[in-house]
Amino acid sequence: MPKMKTNRSAAKRFRVTRKGKIIRNHAYKSHKTRKKRRNVLRALRKKDVVSSADKNRVLRLLGKK
């Protein structure tokens, strides 16, 4: 059976930590930022963890499962 290909768009968006959590960037921070408050933009710069409902789907795209 051939190896499973990694989805390249998912590989650029997600990263798996050593403990198995999946890290992602926030959306809504590159366009129409003039309307948004400073503290909102600062919060959007931080990384976020993928929810447990989406974890298996992302792992499959990354070829880890």
From Swiss-Prot:
One of its GO terms (biological process) is translation. Pfam families: Ribosomal_L35p (PF01632). GO terms for cellular component: cytosolic large ribosomal subunit. Keywords: Ribonucleoprotein, Ribosomal protein. InterPro entries: Ribosomal_bL35, Ribosomal_bL35-like, Ribosomal_bL35_CS, Ribosomal_bL35_sf. Signal peptide: none annotated. One of its GO terms (molecular function) is structural constituent of ribosome. It comes from the Bacteria. Belongs to the bacterial ribosomal protein bL35 family. HAMAP family: Ribosomal_bL35 (MF_00514). This is Large ribosomal subunit protein bL35.
